[in-house]
A protein has these predicted regions:
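Inter-Walker segment of RecA-like/P-loop motor cores
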Residues: 1-14
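Conserved helicase motor core of SF1/SF2 NTP-dependent helicases
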Residues: 13-15, 20-32, 36-341
């Protein structure tokens, strides 16, 4: 059926900027991928021009970037007056339009829950990225409803990591044995230095990169083997400086970026530097969270962990991170599995 069908692929911005396309051709079906990252106004024109639509996305990962605060984009919960008239806010509440920063995808999911319906929702339970030992924590904390399962792909069936060179020390042994690892960092705040920089964690990340490059040898691929995620661009620069000092050209080509820009990407090994050294920075690090079925869904942490195919390595200050429930549970989980150094 698909082979005999003419399929047109384009971005939402391209399609909406060329409305004449819909005058030339009528589409029976529109499939919108990554729809949880698209705001409702950007989709309405497209969806009204087709007979049927399918939205694909994950509202438990990062949503669209909105400049307004959550309060400013929110819908009042009581009736409001405007130009002498009365707006009945209950109408919007009934269709789960509670905040304009939410995607249509997320609103429809909540609307179905609110109406206790499920016939319009399909869950893709199979995932072909994370090894089961990495997927266990996101499943336990974020995907209790969905209960993701491996496809399985070949790397998801591997029982051991392919690090065969002799170990240099205990950390190498840990890297060989565990897929979820946490390395504690130390306080290293300096006067007149940005809070968005952590020299100790940058050094840890650089050392980990050296070790991974050594283990992979000729198999190392800068675009596939390893990636580094940090919350601040200042930290990216510090890690880059450390890599330059190693004198390993292949490592200078790896991707080091924020969680927001890493969404949609994957690497065999992901190194996540929490970076923060102040309790107040936890609000930024875990700011994109919500509660579902009594459980906290931390979208940023979810994205970070689910980028990894074979190994997830994290470094952060335990004394700071313990002040956040999810981060505390993450460290406890890694300890329970033996991956806490």
């Amino acid at each position: 059926y698909i082979i005999g069908t003419r399929v047109i692929v384009g971005t939402t911005s391209m399609m909406t900027s060329k409305p004449f396309i819909f005058l030339l051709k009528h589409f029976k079906l529109a499939i919108i991928d990554e729809s949880s990252q698209i705001l409702e106004p950007n989709l309405i024109g497209l969806l009204s021009a087709v007979d049927k639509f399918i939205l694909i996305g994950d509202y438990k990962q990062l949503p669209a970037v909105v400049q307004q605060s959550e309060q400013d984009s929110g819908i009042p919960t009581i009736n409001d007056s405007q130009k002498g008239g009365i707006i009945d806010m209950s109408i919007l509440q009934d269709i789960c339009l509670t905040n304009c920063r939410n995607s249509l995808f997320e609103r429809l999911i909540h609307w179905e829950d609110y109406e206790e319906r499920s016939e319009f929702i399909g869950i893709l339970r199979r995932q072909g990225r994370m090894h089961p030992e990495i997927a266990e924590f996101p499943n336990r904390m974020f995907y209790r409803r969905e209960k993701l399962e491996p496809v399985p792909c070949p790397h998801q069936l591997e029982t051991e990591l392919s690090y065969t060179l002799p170990s240099e020390d205990a950390l190498d042994d840990l890297l060989k044995e565990h897929r979820m690892i946490f390395l504690p960092s130390k306080f290293c705040k300096e006067p007149n230095v940005s809070d968005k920089i952590n020299a100790n964690e940058a050094a840890i990340v650089v050392d980990l990169l050296r070790r991974i490059h050594r283990f992979y040898g000729e198999r190392f691929d800068a675009k596939k083997t390893v990636g580094v995620i940090v919350p601040y661009r200042n930290q990216i620069a510090m890690v880059r400086k450390g890599i330059e000092k190693l004198g390993i050209p292949e490592l200078e080509k790896i991707s080091i970026d924020t969680i927001e820009r890493y969404q949609g990407s994957q690497r065999d090994v992901i190194i996540y530097s929490f970076t923060i050294q102040n309790i107040w920075q936890l609000d930024f690090l875990a700011g994109n969270s919500f509660v579902e079925d009594g459980a906290i869904i931390d979208r940023k942490l979810n994205v970070a962990i689910t980028r990894a195919r074979k190994q997830m390595i994290m470094t952060g200050n335990p004394e700071i991170l313990r002040n956040n429930q999810i981060f505390s549970e993450l460290m406890n989980y890694v300890k329970e599995k033996g991956g806490y150094f």
